[in-house]
Curated annotation (Swiss-Prot):
It comes from the Bacteria. It holds the Pfam family Zn_ribbon_NrdR. Residues 49-139 form the ATP-cone domain. Negatively regulates transcription of bacterial ribonucleotide reductase nrd genes and operons by binding to NrdR-boxes. GO terms for molecular function: ATP binding; DNA binding; zinc ion binding. The lineage of its organism: Bacteria, Pseudomonadati, Pseudomonadota, Betaproteobacteria, Burkholderiales. GO terms for biological process: negative regulation of DNA-templated transcription. Belongs to the NrdR family. The keyword Repressor applies. This is Transcriptional repressor NrdR.
């Protein structure tokens, strides 16, 4: 690694710490030429597939958008933040494991539905009513009957 002080290319790692989430590493380094110390951070770079909307537009995947969808569906429901985070991690892992450059928004929606159904039935019905564009009480009845089975 190049020293930020003297641009020498040879540095030594003198300390390494893995952060709790195990997604990043902090390293203290010392330059072999000027002996100055500096810190570097390493983090894996993952690329999520682009999301293809119903109208054909392609947008960048958004973790925050997914989290907001979960929070909206689970508003005032007894589900911990940890369980929500775990559900989102499972969805993101599935998206990465697909190995695709693009994924239809409908596929993400179905993954969300599957996770919500496991977390909280009321949240599942809330999300489904918007996602599937319910038009009347019969749509709700059909879904509630399905959930009760």
């Amino acid at each position: 690694m190049k020293c930020p002080f003297c641009s020498h290319l040879e540095t030594q790692v003198i300390e390494t710490r893995v952060f709790e989430d195990a997604a990043s590493i902090r390293r203290r380094r010392q330059c072999a030429a000027c002996s100055k110390r500096f810190t570097t951070y390493e983090r894996s770079d993952v690329s999520f597939p682009a999301v293809v909307k119903k109208d054909g537009r392609r947008v960048e995947y958004g973790h925050d958008k997914l989290l907001a969808s979960f929070k909206l569906a689970l508003r005032k429901r007894p589900v911990s933040t940890g369980r929500i985070d775990s559900a989102i991690e499972r969805i993101e892992e599935k998206l990465l494991n697909l190995g695709l450059r693009e994924v239809p928004s409908s596929r993400i929606g179905e993954l969300v539905m599957r996770e919500l159904k496991k977390l909280d039935k009321v949240a599942y019905i809330r999300f489904a009513s918007v996602y599937r564009s319910f038009e009347g009480i019969d749509d709700f009845r059909a879904l509630v009957d399905e959930v009760r089975k």
